[in-house]
């Protein structure tokens, strides 16, 4: 029975060590991404807009169009953009 506990303990240790290695890799990658944003900023690009572009590129076209339509609806409701009337669309 102690052999089974030893195997479980070894498996648990292996999982923990793999997760720790992956967490370290994730931190390294996050640091690399931060460096790229800094480099882009130093070249005159807006990091906030770059993040937005990357976010948009991750979406599929239908999802993006749906979100843009909802955003337009909210902005129109707040008077931040002119409302499109039915006669204007025709």
Swiss-Prot record:
Its domain of life?
Answer: Bacteria
GO molecular function annotation: DNA binding
Pfam families reported in the protein's UniProt record: GapR_DNA-bd
The residues forming the signal peptide are: none
Classification via InterPro entries:
GapR-like (IPR018753), GapR-like_DNA-bd (IPR046367)
Q: Which HAMAP family match?
A: UPF0335 (MF_00797)
Q: What is this protein called?
A: UPF0335 protein R02793
Originating organism: Rhizobium meliloti (strain 1021) (Ensifer meliloti)
Q: The organism's lineage?
A: Bacteria, Pseudomonadati, Pseudomonadota, Alphaproteobacteria, Hyphomicrobiales
